[in-house]
C-alpha cells in the first residue's frame, strides 16, 4: 500500500494482461500457479472499465493497484510455496473464525482473542506478503514491513477520518479477505466500486478453491508457530460458510450480531470514505443499495447454511454485550469452545481491552443511513427472516 494511491491518476484501469505484466515486473516473478484467479479478475477488470463503475482518473489508479496487489500476492505466495514445500504438512486445527455484519464488533473481539499467546492471527503486512512469519524482533529491519508501516503512517495523516472508522497499521491483526483475492473471489471489491457483472459472477461461484488456497496461506505463514491456534476474521465469511466448513471442518465460528440499520449505515460510511473521489457513480444511493444487497445476501446465506453443522462449533455474540463487558464476552467464547482461560490470558485480554478504549485506536465514527438513499424499513425488510 502506498500513499501515492491517494493522489496518482490514470486515464484507464488497463487490461488484465497489462496488470499481470506489471505485477511480474514489480516482483521479477512469472509463476501465477494454476491460474484459478484469472477468470474472476478478468471479469473484475472488464467491469471496472465500464460506465457503471464510472471511475475517475484517481479511481482508475486505485482500482488498478487493488488488482495488481492481488496478482502480486499470487506471485509471491507461489514463490514461497515452492521455497517451503513442507508448509503443506502444517496442521490447522480448530481455527476460530469471526464473522457477522460489518461494524458488529468483530475487530475488537478479534484483537481480544488474539491477545492469548497461544493464538495467532494474520498481521496486516503478512496478509499482503505471505511468508513464514519471521521473529517479531526482526520486523522493523524488513524492508517490506518498513515500507508498509511508513505508508500507513502517511495514510493516517492524510485520512484521519478513515483511521477513526477502522484503525490499521502493518502490525495489526487484520481481515483475511486478501488471501481470498488470490483466487479472484472477494466481496471486498464490491465495497469499492459499482460492479454489477462481477457481483453476478461472484454470486454463482463455489468458493471451495478460494478457501483451499486460504488454508495453504495459513500453513505457510504459521510454519514457525505450529502450536498456536489461528484466530481469523472477515465479515464476508458469511457468504461462503459451506466452502469454509468443507476446508476447515473443525472450525469454530463466532457470529456477531447488531441491529442491521446501524450496520448498513456504518458500512456505507466506510465504503464512501475509502472511495471518495474514485467514481462518478459509486456515491450516495448507489453505495447504499449495493451495500444493502451485499450484506443482506451474506446474512441469508449464512443462516441458510448454519443449520447443517454442529451447533457446538458456533457461538453468538451480541454487540451490546460486547460493549458492556469485553472481557466477559471473550471468556464466554473460551468457555463455549473448551479453551483454557488462564490468569495469563485474562491479563493479556485486559490489556487489549484497556488499549481499545483509549489512545490512537479509539473509535471515532459517525454516519447517517439517509446519506446513502436508504430508509430503515428498506434495511429491516432486506434482513427479515
Q: What positions do the PLM features span?
A:
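PAPS-dependent sulfotransferases, especially Golgi type II membrane carbohydrate sulfotransferases
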Residues: 1-79, 195-211, 218-225, 267-316, ...
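Pre-Walker A (Motif I) flank of P-loop NTPase domains
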Residues: 93-96
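Glycine-rich phosphate-binding P-loop
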Residues: 98-116
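Short His-Asn-centered micro-motif
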Residues: 99-101, 231-235, 319
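Post-Walker A helix-loop "phosphate-sensing" segment adjacent to the P-loop in P-loop NTPases
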Residues: 115-125
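PAPS-dependent sulfation machinery
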Residues: 128-230
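Conserved phosphate-donor/acceptor-positioning beta-strand/loop module used by diverse small-molecule
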Residues: 233, 244-269
